[in-house]
Amino acid sequence: MVNRVHLTWDGEHRFDAGRPGGVTHRIDASARTGPSPVDTLLNALAACTSVDVVDILAKRRTPVRSLEVDVEGARAAETPARLVGILLTFRIAGAGIERVHAERAIELAVTKYCSVRDSLDPNLPVRWALELEA
């Protein structure tokens, strides 16, 4: 399996990215007209883990009504200012979702199923928290 994406430079520090012939989104190093490259990476991690969380909970017959994720990426002070830690805070709502099951779904997503997480440095700490709403 191979994923293909295409990126076009607009002459500044902005790029339009997406699948060839598909929908594009703006990536902006200054984060003025779109997320920065690092923001895009953090969004990819949030989206990837969220897909898994929703699927895992659906298999338990406890469908998610809403899900939001706030992501904090701590960065090194020196160039290239790589990520040194990530915190994912999941806010999940759905009738009948038990805390233990939501926590297990997040743990499995972060440690086993998310291909974005698995593609990052295994020594990069990725922590998570859960806010569960009825």
Give the location of each predicted region.
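Extended beta-strand/beta-hairpin segments
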Residues: 1-44, 53-134
